[in-house]
Amino acid sequence: GFYGILKAMDGVVPYRLEMQAKLPAAGCKNLYDFWGSRLYFELTQNDKSILNLASKEYSKSIEKYLTLRDKYITIVFCELSGDKLVTKGTYAKMARGEMVRFMAENSIENPEDIKKFDRLGYAFRHDLSSDTEYIFERRIEITSY
């Protein structure tokens, strides 16, 4: 949230600043207020397609500006816990990074090709996904001793 939109070779310094953190500078109450619609317009100036790999906290900075012309696909990484699919934060964060690597290594530009992602035990779930939300389930191997 602090740096805005970054390019592949942009340098950053490690920091921990959440989007909803109070921001007394520039008359803004938080980073959502500071960035306003600028992040959305930067993302959509050349293409109206957005693949959302961000956490819910960061997604909020874009979603409220979406229009009907935008193609917005949210990626969800989850696993079965009891009889429910749940997102486990640490694994989801690892999977988001791994998906970016997968897309870069395979020069992926078509959203359909993202469905081939199969790293870290995740597989695309056709039955749970839609045109706007791609669900990837992590299969956990249960080892008995």
Please provide the spans of the model-predicted regions.
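Internal, well-folded beta-alpha domain core
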Residues: 1-130, 135-145
